[in-house]
Amino acid sequence: MMSLVTAADLKAWISRGGELAILDAREEGEFGHGHLFWAVPCPLSKKELRARALLPRKATRVVCVDGGEGHAQKLAAYLTSLGHSDVHVLKGGTPAWKEAGYTVFTGVHVPSKAFGEWVEHHYGTESLDPPELQALVDSGKPLVILDSRPMDEYVKMTIPGSVNVPGGELAYRIGDMVPDAETTIVVNCAGRTRSIMGAESLRRAGVPNRIVALRNGTMGWELAGFTCERGQTRTYPAGTPKSADLALQRATAFGDENGVKVISRAAAEELLSDESRTTYALDVRAADEYAAGHIPGFRHAPGGQLVQATDQWIAVRGARVILADDDTVRSRMTGAWLRQLGGWEVYVVQEASKGATVSGPWKPQVPEVKPATTVTAQALAAEKGVTVVDLARSIDFRAGHIPGAVWAVRGRIPKIEGAVVVTAPDATLAHLAAAEIPGARVLEGGVAAWKAAGLPVAADRQTPPDEACVDWYLRPYDRNSGIEEAMKEYLSWEIDLVHEVERDGDSRFGAW
């Protein structure tokens, strides 16, 4: 069943607790211009993939929202067609929410970012500004700078001399990387909250060093007149750290303090088979570890990103979350923060690496896919008069695409005369889109296969232009103009989130 719900009723549902997912049917770029605090992007263009990942239980109460364009009704109808039984649409969408006097938030990953700011206020995380860091570097005193972002962000720009250690790895790796207590540890990100969360993770774990967050990250560094390094790949040593036992002691204390429960694989399977509750199964290790082998059914969600971009993986408030890694260190640290962020019931799998595993990425089953005819990169390169439609993220299309390709969002592909070949980072998405274009084929292996074949790639930072990037909420560095002003606005936005959250009243950070 699908029904309309008023803003007042939805507000009451949020306050009441229990399982609830609020899915916004717009593209991320549109979503970022104004949305509900607990809303999670589930754009129509990727609904078959996102809905199955975000809603593992079909009896969960779901409210679909949009900006008043009618997308929410389409998403709700799709969910109903899949068998979801408690689906609603917010009457009037986000505009009606605002008209009712409730807070509308801009930006993305808002609960996670607001939580990071709360952590700094609550725990008194020490920070230093860029000139202070430069003075510390110049002093010659023992110092290590750790960049807590994923490697793809680190490569683009980082603080000179820093080493990439994503947030979920920090407490696990720190004993090997900084074995003495005299070295000052500085954690940075691009802005504020991942620096704060990384530094505070080390402090909560009981690391005895002086630990500080770089205030305003790489943005603040460049705004202060310093230059970032680009193209660096420095990172932590691979494999299990020698100090893993110490890391486990530290993580156990933090996890226990925050109510993280440890269970066996058999118990995890029982929870996952319980149809009365929504249960997420997430593996918080690094991507290469996950790909090499993981528990069947567990999605990859690197720990630091799971805490700071939670809505990529978790949509249901009141759900259970099961985390896995090799020795529970990363799971316990991640789980403790998830408990404080959203009060989810968190479990950690003991001896997760023992027993059956599968390799490769997690992929949802999408039975409605009708496989299209495929074409290899070499064959496509030899053809004439073919239009390639690329469904990659707009910022990825800018960085590299097949010459002459047209960038588009599924569902908004312009009418094209003649032969069409669709490519997308996800093959399922490519086949879904091709089925909506008469006669369209799919590029086998996507642009990655094109590059692997040694074929030419075009790059153009202006295409698509900023205003056309509806699929991606542009970060300051993604923009083609006004970058410095955008950085200042972003940093101010993060700082003010704590106050906006207080005004909204729909969150309760801390111990649950």
Model features per residue range: what roles?
Residues 1-21, 25-144, 148-280, 284-387, ...:
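Rhodanese-like catalytic fold shared by cysteine-dependent sulfurtransferases
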